[in-house]
A protein has these predicted regions:
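N-terminal leader/targeting and accessory segments in enzymes
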Residues: 1-105, 109, 303, 394
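Nucleotide phosphate-binding/pyrophosphate-handling subdomain across enzymes
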Residues: 3-15, 25-35, 275-380
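Residues in the short beta-alpha loop(s) of Rossmann-like NAD(P)-binding domains
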Residues: 22, 45-47, 151, 228-229, ...
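Phosphate-binding loop of NTP-binding sites
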Residues: 33-34, 71-77, 84-227, 231-242, ...
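Short internal beta-strands
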Residues: 38-45, 223-227, 358-359, 378-387
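Beta-strand->loop->alpha-helix junctions that form or flank phosphate-binding loops
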Residues: 43-45, 65-68, 104-108, 240-258, ...
Length: 461
């Protein structure tokens, strides 16, 4: 393992392209420029949209390739740093690779240089909560913990100060994993269901990307899989190193499971109760699964008393079944992280009454058939907005039992109108939930902005 200084020295005299000026790549660009390396920033935004950021990087020596043709000359560079948002299968990246340019990324470089243990989490749902729980468990046990990937901040600027005794916890998306050539020391696969098919095109490509979280593991490493998910249970047989399963529905001979209203763990040291379910403060059976995954990840690293201490105070992550307020006897919840049908179904399962649900958003090419069935059972009023509103409506109206369900469907033009419609439909005792089952890109920058706007709208009622 080289140091970051040695790595930068190996790039001296080479032409470097960095695709994108996003959250993870901008610190990388600064580091490369401060090492006096030749960097060209390639970004699809026109100069006027990124003027302030571009001016700062230009003052450090950056050159730019901006606008719609920002990828057109990648093949001329000696090294290309990819942004997760651009697929490695993009024709211009393929062309650059064929010409001999190494294609890498900020996260791949971090893995290459990191001196300490890395725990990584991927899956279709539950990544952020599981990542957060793992990091909180480790902090409670006294470790110096760095959190990054899809959450937290870019880790590369901190790598020079890390020591072998530290811990790194990263949330990894399929976009990041596609080209990874190293796996975390502990990898967690929460579950897998159709998602991001607008990017990956097929479920097979999506699954193949996710596999990199454990494919490159070495002896002594561990991979954690969800036994209750058909795909991850099958993938667990491919784990090249240590493996641990968790299951909410089945008692396992070895692994993490439920028994007597508590989470238990059985390994070669025996069986023990780790966490009473009564200690968990966040709602939903899916969050029990998130706890199980995190407990499996830290087994042997964190005493059980630390797990219990975290559970007794942890109230969840923003935008995940987050109570916004109670107004006139009606509770309003923000579950903007519900960016897929499976997430929204998990949200519906977290309540013991029929909901007023606000759903719809950007179309990722994911089917809504099963969600439609669940909505007829668990939703009293469905308020739709966004690009997918017609597709969700169709799935609900074609679901068995829709005619008898009494489910009312309201279509609105935007989130503000949807909140107003939900308030109009609500009576004391009702629960209104934003859980869109879709990404936010049709009307918002991301799910966080959507959740923030929702909370502002609700607090203004």
């Amino acid at each position: 393992m080289s140091t970051i200084t040695e790595y930068f020295e190996s790039l001296r005299g080479k032409s470097i392209a960095v695709i994108g000026m996003g959250v993870s790549n901008t610190p990388l660009i600064r580091m490369l420029l401060r090492a006096d390396l030749k960097v060209t920033v390639c970004d699809k935004s026109p100069r006027e949209r990124v003027e302030e950021q571009a001016a700062e990087l230009e003052s450090l020596g950056a050159k730019f390739q901006l606008g719609p043709d920002y990828l057109s000359k990648l093949y001329k560079f000696d090294v290309v740093f990819r942004t997760p948002g651009v697929s490695p299968n993009h024709p211009e990246l393929v062309k650059a690779a064929e010409k001999g340019s190494p294609i890498t990324s900020e996260m791949e470089l971090f893995f290459q240089l990191c001196p300490c243990k890395i725990l990584g989490v991927t899956g279709s749902d539950g990544k952020t909560t599981t990542t957060t729980l793992i990091s909180e468990f480790l902090k409670e046990a006294g470790y110096n913990v760095y959190v990054g990937g899809n959450i937290g901040k870019p880790l590369l600027p901190d790598v020079a100060g890390m020591v072998p005794e530290d811990m790194v916890v990263v949330e990894l998306s399929s976009f990041q994993l596609m080209t990874m050539k190293q796996s975390p020391n502990v990898s967690v696969f929460t579950n897998l269901s159709p998602n991001h098919l607008d990017y990956h095109h097929t479920m097979e490509e999506y699954t193949a990307a996710k596999l990199n979280i454990f494919t490159h593991q070495q002896a002594g490493d561990r991979a954690v899989f969800n036994y209750d998910n058909d795909i991850t249970r099958s993938l667990s047989r491919q784990a090249p190193a240590g493996m641990m399963l968790f299951s909410r529905r089945n008692k396992l001979e070895e692994g993490v499971y439920l028994r007597d209203n508590a989470i238990w763990l059985t390994n070669d040291m025996g069986s023990r109760e780790v966490l009473p379910l009564a200690d968990i403060r966040i709602p939903g059976v899916h969050n029990i699964e998130n706890y199980m995954a995190a407990i499996a990840a830290v087994d042997g690293l964190v005493p059980d008393k630390c797990v219990r201490a975290v559970a007794q105070r942890f109230t969840g992550v923003e935008h995940r079944i987050e109570l916004v307020r109670e107004l006139n006897g009606v509770k309003y919840y923000n579950d903007s992280i519900g960016t897929s049908p499976t997430r929204t179904m998990a949200c519906l399962d977290s309540f013991d009454q029929k909901l007023i649900l606000i759903a719809g958003g950007y179309d990722k090419g994911v089917p809504f058939t099963q969600l439609g069935v669940e909505m007829t059972k668990k939703v009293k009023t469905l308020v739709l907005c966004g690009a997918t509103a017609p597709a969700i409506r169709k799935a609900v109206e074609e679901a068995p039992g829709f005619a008898e369900s009494g489910l009312e469907i309201v279509e609105t033009s935007n989130l503000a109108a949807a909140v107003a419609a939900a308030q109009a439909a609500a009576v004391p005792g009702d629960v209104v939930v934003l859980s869109p089952a879709c990404a936010a890109f049709d009307q918002f920058k991301n799910f966080m902005e959507r959740g923030k706007v929702f909370k502002e709208l609700v607090n203004a009622l």
